[in-house]
Design a protein with these regions (language model features):
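Short, intrinsically disordered low-complexity segments
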Residues: 56-61
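Active-site loop segments of alpha/beta catalytic cores
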Residues: 1-51, 62-302
């Protein structure tokens, strides 16, 4: 099976013999391919970005490629790559998530003193997202990734009680809307969200990407607690920054074991292929993944 076929099987409720691989973002095209986006004229960058995505599918076997947050980008990507990779649409503003530094104090004050005001904003956010989803499907989106960072490294951005009031009802609506469009949806969230997972799982969302080791998230425990979930992650990005071969290979084996082989799992980093990652780190990560896949395929009965 191709990576695309494996991912299609997972999204339809099945389990491939070995997990597919893709990443939410790829930002080392210059280091890996010699392709310098900063040297490309603005009007030529959409075509440049598609060329990069073709390279990652052809050379790394990605099962999906970023469709983006914009309907035009989703359509452009689907038209160019839809025959060889799935194209998810991204949405990042449908619910409240971790506020930026300059807004943090104001958000905290409103959370305790003006909850009605926040609820009105939450309603508007959700409604805008629900308008976007059918447009994205019409543009060719095969599934959705909602990018809502709910956690800092040591704790969620709000208490479980406030999360249940301010996020869960709207996230549930978002999931229901996407399911009504016959699409699946995966949550991307960095950080420590252990105390939120029961509430997130109860929304009906289909999967969870990141399972962030820097946020003290244990993929073995998450898999044990939510065996039906599609999990995606969680090779530690801080480890990839350091290019420590033994540590990277150990992290890959942990992901493939517990994520993992024989389960509804997508192999990836705990975030993305970020700018500044040494290309050798990604090569090591892929090499160990491919070695495990080859071992599984060799040992499988005919």
């Amino acid at each position: 099976m191709t990576g695309k076929q494996k991912l299609e099987l997972i999204l339809s409720g099945g389990v491939p013999d070995t997990p597919p691989h893709w990443e939410l973002v790829f930002q080392i095209q210059k280091e890996m391919f010699g392709m310098d986006r900063s040297a490309v004229a603005k009007e030529d960058r959409p075509a440049f970005d598609l060329d990069v995505l073709h390279r990652v599918v052809d050379e790394f076997g990605w099962a999906a490629v970023r469709g983006g947050y914009d309907v035009a980008e989703i359509k452009r990507t689907k038209d160019s790559l839809g025959s060889k990779a799935l194209v998810p649409a991204y949405e990042g503003d449908g619910v409240f998530w971790m506020p930026t530094g300059e807004n943090m104090v104001d958000f905290a004050v409103r959370l305790y003193e003006r909850m009605d005001e926040l609820q009105a904003e939450a309603r508007a956010k959700c409604d805008r997202a629900k308008e976007f989803f059918p447009q994205a499907v019409d543009a060719g989106a095969d599934f959705f990734v909602v990018t809502y960072d709910f956690g800092y490294n040591d704790a969620p951005f709000i208490s479980p009680e406030h999360f249940g009031q301010l996020v869960v009802p709207y996230l549930t609506e978002i999931v229901e809307t996407i399911h009504d469009l016959d699409r699946k949806v995966i949550l991307h969230s960095d950080g420590c969200i252990r105390v939120l997972l029961d509430q997130i799982h109860a929304t009906g969302i289909d999967g969870y990407q990141s399972v962030d080791p820097q946020g003290h998230m244990d993929i073995e425990q998450v898999r044990r607690d939510y065996p039906d979930w599609i999990l995606m992650g969680n090779v530690a990005c801080n480890m990839l920054q350091d290019a420590d071969e033994a540590s990277i290979r150990t992290s890959v084996r942990n992901c493939m074991t517990h994520g993992g082989v024989g389960k509804r799992y997508i192999f990836s980093t705990s975030n993305c292929i970020f700018a500044g990652m040494p290309p050798e780190s990604y090569r090591i990560m892929l090499d160990e993944y491919r070695r495990i896949v080859a071992e599984c395929e060799t040992s499988s009965p005919e």
